[in-house]
Amino acid sequence: MTTESAFINILRGFAKDPAARGLLDDAAVVEVGDSCLIITHDMMAEDVHFKSNANPADVAWKLVASNLSDLAAKGALPIGVLLGFMLGDDDWDRAFAAGLEKVLGHYGVALLGGDTVSNRGDKRALGLTALGIATNRPVPSRAGAQVGDIVYVTGTLGDALAGFELIDAGFDEVGALADAFNRPQARLTEGQKLAPFVHAMMDISDGLLIDAERMATASRLGIEIDLACIPLSPAYVSYRTDSLESRMQAASWGDDYELLFCAPAGARINVDATAVGRVIAGGGLTLCNGDAPVKLPPTLGYQHH
């Protein structure tokens, strides 16, 4: 089966409009007069992104949050969404709609339209397009990192991983860890605050390591991540302990929806973020644990295939 990266490479051959940014970014950036319209689209598929017994309201929340996270990486103000919905069981559909109304209300985002289709199979697939207006020019991209920049990440990593494992094991009451997996928070305010001074920014839905490598590739430079600096929550440490292995897992699993960004050394960071590395000459991703080099793991993060 074609991998995600291989298929995107095929599309890249004819996605030549400047707004597409070479399909190397989180979203399209369309110049409209004096403004920039930010457009992104994400999909969720049953048994890939959510299980058949998942709460439909949680599915709706995550579908919206994952799209808004891409807008956050552009420092954008959301203005609305378009839903692509595969019809099925009536109770599930109604619960999804109620959850969608709730999450859109939480973020103050309008439902502008979309499309529905009947489901001839036994698995659902859902899509959402999110629209936003850039709050800063130039609009941040993955490709602007500069040698000497400090690499930061907002929030903490690994909670979604722990939440997924606990839910998968049948635990019903796992609190914040379950919420991190089922109902991630898009860092819209943080993205808007960071947009004026970052050199590069993206969200890390697929995992810190794989997305740091993507940023390095887009910027044609290298990024070194110090695993000793990976921010972990007390709940994650209580569940998995604080070790090199647990930090590696937190950095490579994904579903965190935090912001990864590069800023000049000495810049005053105006959001809750942790310095986790630096931009270096060369290319690709390298890892260390303090002063000790660390070999890259076989899998840096999540890729569809």
Where are these regions (language model features)?
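Internal active-site segments that recognize and position negatively charged phosphoryl groups
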Residues: 146-155, 183-208
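Active-site glycine-rich loop that binds ribose-phosphate moieties when present
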Residues: 129-140, 147, 174-193
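Short, compositionally biased
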Residues: 161-178
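Small-aliphatic-rich amphipathic alpha-helix that forms the alpha element of a beta-alpha
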Residues: 56-82, 95-106, 193, 207-215
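Extreme N-terminal cap/leader segments of soluble proteins
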Residues: 1-55, 74, 83, 103-104, ...
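Glycine-rich anion-binding loops of enzyme active sites
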Residues: 34, 44, 77-165
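Glycine-/charge-enriched secondary-structure boundary and capping motifs
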Residues: 1-5, 9-10, 88-112, 117-126, ...
